[in-house]
């Protein structure tokens, strides 16, 4: 895997992104209807027959700045894919993309994202940008980017929230439209704390997407605490964009 990771990083650094970067989609489901309402775009590295998970190369690209061209490339390819879907089938789905602080530090990020969206005739209201990490005192450009994205109609989410303490610290920086709870929130040792966190979220009226849904007990527990949306192996693993198109973007018969 080390050789494959090196290949992916080199593809980004040499601007040969199409040779080493691709994306998959993990469907997001309405928990009450067991219906797919969209999907999360997830970057993957590719080298020969190997699929390289993002944890192998993202941190390195964040250090070198390669995350910027890679992020733009994935966003552009995802927008093109979504734009190719039948008009009637892309009016309602929600697609989520992960955005790092390094990207948000770039003052031109929101302008590029909105320009790409406009060129593909896509509506901002169909997208959620998940903020994957941030420091307690972000640069001014971060808030400016979030402002511009929000004003344009893109919904924002804090990603990977695993505790009430983390949630409150994130909301002190920016109040988002969604909270994405980490899969660890559903483990037996954390579930009671998760219920308390959900009670707090319900009081401030923010929608939740829960990761790591693996059984019907998870579904019923989340529904009882006001969670509408989820993703996990009970519904689907991350799948190729071609599979997502065939499975979830076809007209009802």
Regions found by a protein language model. Give the residues of each.
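Inter-domain helical "communication" segments and dimerization helices
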Residues: 1-22, 66-69, 87-90, 118-119, ...
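EAL-family c-di-GMP phosphodiesterase catalytic domain
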Residues: 1-7, 11-16, 31-32, 44-50, ...
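Residues at or immediately flanking beta-strands
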Residues: 20-22, 56, 92-96, 126-128, ...
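A short, well-structured catalytic beta-strand-centered motif of the EAL phosphodiesterase domain
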Residues: 22-59
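Catalytic core of bacterial c-di-GMP phosphodiesterases, primarily the EAL and HD-GYP domains
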Residues: 68-141
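Charged helix-capping and loop-helix junction motifs
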Residues: 111-115, 143-144, 191-196
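Hydrophobic positions in alpha-helices of CheY-like receiver
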Residues: 117, 149, 197-201
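Mobile, glycine- and charge-enriched loop segments
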Residues: 146-153
């Amino acid at each position: 895997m080390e050789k494959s990771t090196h290949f992916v990083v080199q593809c980004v650094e040499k601007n040969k992104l199409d040779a080493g970067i691709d994306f998959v989609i993990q469907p997001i489901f309405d928990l009450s209807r067991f219906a797919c309402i969209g999907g999360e775009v997830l970057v993957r590295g590719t080298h020969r027959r190997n699929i390289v998970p993002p944890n192998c190369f993202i941190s390195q690209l964040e250090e070198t700045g390669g995350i910027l061209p890679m992020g733009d490339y994935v966003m552009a390819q995802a927008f093109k894919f979504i734009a190719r879907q039948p008009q009637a089938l892309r009016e309602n789905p929600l697609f989520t993309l992960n955005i790092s602080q390094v990207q948000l530090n770039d003052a031109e990020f929101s302008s590029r994202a909105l320009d790409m969206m406009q060129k593909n005739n896509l509506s901002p209201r169909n997208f959620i940008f998940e903020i994957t990490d941030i420091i307690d005192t972000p640069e001014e450009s971060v808030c400016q980017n979030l402002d511009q994205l929000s004003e344009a109609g893109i919904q924002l989410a804090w990603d990977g929230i695993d505790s009430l303490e983390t949630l409150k610290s994130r909301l002190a920086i920016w109040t988002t439209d969604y909270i994405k709870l980490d899969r660890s929130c559903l483990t037996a040792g954390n579930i009671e704390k998760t219920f308390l966190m959900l009670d707090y979220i319900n009081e401030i009226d923010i929608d939740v997407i829960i990761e790591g849904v693996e059984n019907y007990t998870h579904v019923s527990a989340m529904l009882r605490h006001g969670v509408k949306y989820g993703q996990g192996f009970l519904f689907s693993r991350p799948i190729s964009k071609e599979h997502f198109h065939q499975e979830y973007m076809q007209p009802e018969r």
